[in-house]
């Protein structure tokens, strides 16, 4: 369905780490498909390609042509600034949410704040997440690592207590105390 994005489909091989498929349709004829795994090791690129092919085949989605292929690794640990004189943004500025890999909206916020600061002669980039959120993400990641056989179930259980808007806020790092209480 060209109107529905699939953010995390866990109905894929979970034997090597927390693995999901992300699908973003651009139209009824174009879509972005991503195989994502939260793990301590990288798999061969063909492993990810095969996961995508299998996911598409299971849904009877036929690809006539592939326009592009990308490959990347998102760090799931805190960034360590190398030079205090440089205003780091993105992954280098700590924008990657440690428990989810989400970064896009935080990078947008950092850019807006940095642009405003530069206009006043400053170059300080705000911390993207609170110390409490970073601590909770580290606890969550430890739980996922310790229970790697059950990580998909643990991840899904985290989200089942929240409605869609609450889950989005939780994943973006802007959840309130009530959402945190539901998750814990």
Language model segments and positions:
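C-terminal helical "tail/cap" subdomain of flavin- and related membrane-associated enzymes
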Residues: 112-184
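Predominantly flavin-linked oxidoreductase catalytic cores and closely associated redox partners
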Residues: 1-65, 75-82
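Flavin-binding catalytic cores
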Residues: 41-70, 84-87, 108-131
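Conserved aromatic-histidine-acidic binding/catalytic patches
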Residues: 40, 44, 99-102, 143
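FAD-binding beta-loop-beta segment adjacent to the flavin cofactor pocket
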Residues: 13-18, 71-89, 98, 143-163
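A conserved FAD-binding loop/helix module that cradles the flavin
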Residues: 92-114
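Generic secondary-structure boundary/loop-capping signal
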Residues: 4-5, 58, 68-71, 93, ...
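Short FAD-binding loop at a beta-strand-to-alpha-helix junction that anchors the flavin cofactor
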Residues: 23, 28-30, 83-100
